[in-house]
A protein has these predicted regions:
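Mature extracytoplasmic or otherwise solvent-exposed domains
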Residues: 19-196
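Fungal secretory targeting signals
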Residues: 1-22
Length: 196
């Protein structure tokens, strides 16, 4: 019984702490656009809110060997308002769903870079890699996660209905070594808030 009580108390504390580490209410996205070879304006669609954002791709596909389309990127430009004073935001994780085909020896490198336009030199990049080290072809659905240990933080909000400036999130995929194919279908992001 003591163990159950202790566990419940710990979970309650962690839940309270998590709730305390985000602004009151949900900031609203008031502007979003995207650019890049993987998401021309007519080939991508955004849905959801800052709590559950989803970017759906219609044209993000790369192939190797291919001198033109072995790499592609999509950069999102986002603004939001409704943040209470005294907060900063960063991107904690990016998740890209898609399908990959890798012959033995082939590699998919994937990168996520985050920065705010007000401080473009202060960027954060996370890299992942998927390699076929086996003897048979890989052909499967994948979720590519990039976690940011070092984060790019927004400036500190100063009013009750402030925004965090222009947030830029760039995802890039690149294939190399052997015959391979990757198609991204959607991207989501997890945000982290802190007091400032």
């Amino acid at each position: 019984m003591g163990t159950i009580t202790s566990t419940f108390t710990t979970l309650l504390f962690l839940t309270t702490l998590a709730l305390a580490e985000s602004p009151a209410g949900t900031p609203r996205i008031n502007s979003i656009s995207y650019s890049g070879s993987g998401c021309p304006q007519t080939q991508a669609r955004f849905s959801g809110s800052l709590d559950n954002p989803t970017l759906t791709f219609n044209h993000f596909a790369i192939e190797y060997p291919n001198t033109v389309n072995r790499t592609a990127n999509c950069q999102v430009h986002m603004q939001a308002q409704g943040v209470s004073a005294g907060w900063q935001v960063s991107v904690k994780d990016t998740f890209v769903d898609g399908h990959v085909t890798l012959d033995p020896g082939a590699t998919l490198d994937y990168f996520s870079t985050v920065y705010f336009s007000s401080s473009a030199d202060d960027s954060a990049t996370s890299k992942g890699q998927l390699t076929n080290d086996g003897s048979s072809r890989i052909d499967k659905a994948v979720t590519l996660q990039n976690h940011f240990t070092d984060k790019a933080w927004s400036s500190c909000t100063t009013s009750s209905n402030d925004g965090f400036g222009i947030l830029n999130i760039n995802f890039r995929g690149a294939l190399r070594n052997e015959k391979s194919y990757f198609e991204a279908t959607s991207e989501t992001w997890d945000f982290e808030w802190r007091r400032c």
